[in-house]
Amino acid sequence: MANQNTHHNLYSSYNQLPEPLFMTIHFLAANEPLIVDGKPRLGYFDDALPIINTSDFVYDNPFGQARSDFQKWLGNKEFQYFGGMSDRLIFGCAIANLRYVAIAFVYVYDIKAQKLWSHSWRSPLGLGFDLANNSRQGETHFRIPAIVDIHLRYQDNPREKTLMIKCKGLDIEVRMDEQGLQPMSICTRTGYSGWTYTAKSAGQPLYGFVKLNDEHIDLQQIKAYGSLDFSTGYMRRETWWNWACSAGEIQAGARKGQRAGLNLSTGVNETSFSENCFWLNGQCYPLNHAQFKFDIKDTLQPWQITADNGQLQLQFQPMGMHREKVRAGFLNTHFRQMFGEFQGCIVLNGEEICLDGLKGFVEDQYIKW
């Protein structure tokens, strides 16, 4: 673990980060639909969008010819992710709509016991599956009778997210309060004809419990923090990304005890805009391009992550991994999400903030869908 002097030497030569996100970026109004005159509005929004009218999108091919209704239906991909992290445990839950199949996974890693509970499910053609079409108000439901029931609920007033999971050996009920949080809300062009919209939030405390194999863990008592990823759009048929996310209380320095959240990615936002950002006490600060260095053949080795010309420098030490690997003709995916601990700093308006000890995730994803 590097000491404060080492961190200071690393960052002393870099410029300050910009002012808070809402002061430096021109925002589009979130209270208007995403699709206007058949085209998506591209850029940053001042809030998560309540109207994602995908059906109004005109999905032409590169030669200006309209694609069929089936191609339009098949081309739209959606996924939602809810994560929780603390010094006691780390958990993640993802639900994805690939049209011809719906996929869900849940894992819980007990840091104290160093044990991983993990399971994934697939539902052909999305049977027993409903997906909220925005992250402000709605419900996502993945259910296989007598096997698993996952319920993700978005509520606008008061602004909060709730996740309930019931399956053999695992019972989760968790709520993340997002009042006072500025989400990252952005839409970018993807490929020639497509687009990707995402709303992300991190760094908010969690309430509720995780019951794993009859052990009941109160999330407020262990100071668990959460993250939410809502993504939809017309993404590339073959694509990839790396992603990092963290949330929790700062553990050292002048900001000790304050709330922090982090979202970093590469390979997702192709042009003009970046979803990379840092949250401090609910306030969102922009970050530019991020770089991920890791051993692609052994992703459990340490990762190095930098952003904003080095104003953010992190090392991530994985504790374990959830993996999905499918080679099935039309669908090919190699997904690896590592969970573990970050070390490093960010320089924010000239102030060095230590992020040592924060828990979170990194991800390496290849998919052809």
Place the predicted regions along the sequence by residue.
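Structured soluble/peripheral alpha/beta segments that form catalytic or ligand/cofactor-binding pockets
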Residues: P20-W369
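N-terminal amphipathic/basic-hydrophobic helices that include classical n-h-c signal peptides
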Residues: M1-F22
